[in-house]
Amino acid sequence: MAKIGVTETVLRDAHQSLIATRMRTDEFEGILEKMDKIGYHSLECWGGATFDSCLRFLDEDPWERLRLIRRKCPNTKLQMLFRGQNMLGYRHYADDLVDYFVKKSIDNGIDILRIFDALNDVRNLETAINAAKKYGGHVQAAISYTTGPVFDIEYYCHYAKQLEDAGADSICIKDMAGLLTPYGTYDLVKALKETVKVPIQLHSHYTSGLASMVHLKGIEAGVDVIDTAISPLAMGTSHPATESMVAALQGTEYDTGLDLKALTEIRDFFNPLREKYLADGLLNPKVLGVDANTLLYQVPGGMLSNLISQLKQAGKEDKLDEVLAEVPRVRKDSGYPPLVTPTSQIVGTQSVFNVILGERYKMVTKEFKDMVAGYYGKTPCDIDPDFRKKICGDEKIIDCRPADLLKPELDTFRNEIAEYYEQEE
């Protein structure tokens, strides 16, 4: 039996990171049966931005994509990314909707649900975790990894224990920004293995150039499964190359058991797609390199490009360094939220406003106000009451689970689209 499991991300996070989730089903359908024979721990193939992208940009049915992958890959576990109470959207949804979406995901072929919350607020995961357990799915609860004064090993061990107690079958260290360092990873994994009994999976983006070393030190510390991407869509803002990690571990006590020759067939299939994406501009060579700003400013690569875009639209591109210096200040003011969807957009946009208007918090976005008021959940650090008053004014402050304020939504949506749909998913 393989010592280290490998989750292949090419069908979801690899192309989400490199080409804005634009890979079409008919582009990868032809290789699925061969991928099913590789022996991966799992195929990450659904959730995250794929659902939105199928509907908004690709004119595809995301449910039919999932059913097709399930038919072609009967022997491999299929995995999705699920944003807890946010599901696959950008706001909190009612419990009945979350429960039903989880049920339908499992019914249509998902085996493993990687469930995370942007604020690491376990309350925002409980409904999704309970639903996945109820309908027979494997719950992989994810820690949104970030850096800052409160984010020490003790913080992560405490959160991991909360996740295990909530019902997690495994735990993923989700390093969405490529902020993990090799030796920091070793210490973190060692501590987590002493704290929880469930398997640990490691997910780290190559943005800062450290992810392969992070994987290796994580494995030495006891990680059970790693996320990789087949080489044509690896590296840069994606993940370490599958073949490289398999070769690095071959013949050691950590041998993955995967066949490099078999992986060559997978690589050869995706190579022409890479060339096509480069030729049509979908794959920008800039995202394939190392972005040292990630290490310097602790800002995820995707967030950095978004900040540049906002400044360009305002004709204030020369203000980038000021905005990058403002981000950690805004993050501190708002309770140190990890910078991942949707909090990265919320903090980033507010930082841009603070700089280009010449006065901090002269204008406050609705989303920033809601986050400070508690409508996204509890922030990792307490927010100063005077700052909260300044931002929120007379708006109601909440400390309950945000979804507790939401009425059931499922029947309302059913009624709204009753005349249009043939089946519910």
Describe these PLM feature segments.
Residues 1-19, 66, 71:
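N-terminal amphipathic alpha-helix/helix-capping segment at the start of soluble metabolic enzymes
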Residues 6-11, 41-45, 76-84, 111-114, ...:
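Hydrophobic faces of well-ordered beta-strands that scaffold small-molecule active sites
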Residues 36, 106, 164-167, 219:
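Non-catalytic positions within long, well-ordered alpha-helices that form the structural scaffold/packing
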Residues 36-54, 284-294, 298-425:
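Terminal or standalone catalytic/regulatory effector modules within metabolic enzymes
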Residues 47-164, 171, 181-182:
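Active-site beta->alpha loop and helix N-cap motifs at the rims of alpha/beta catalytic domains
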Residues 115-118, 175, 221-238:
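Glycine-rich phosphate-binding active-site loops on the catalytic face of alpha/beta enzymes
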Residues 151-163, 208-224:
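Catalytic cores of alpha/beta
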Residues 234-256:
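C-terminal helical cap(s) of enzyme catalytic domains, especially alpha/beta-barrels
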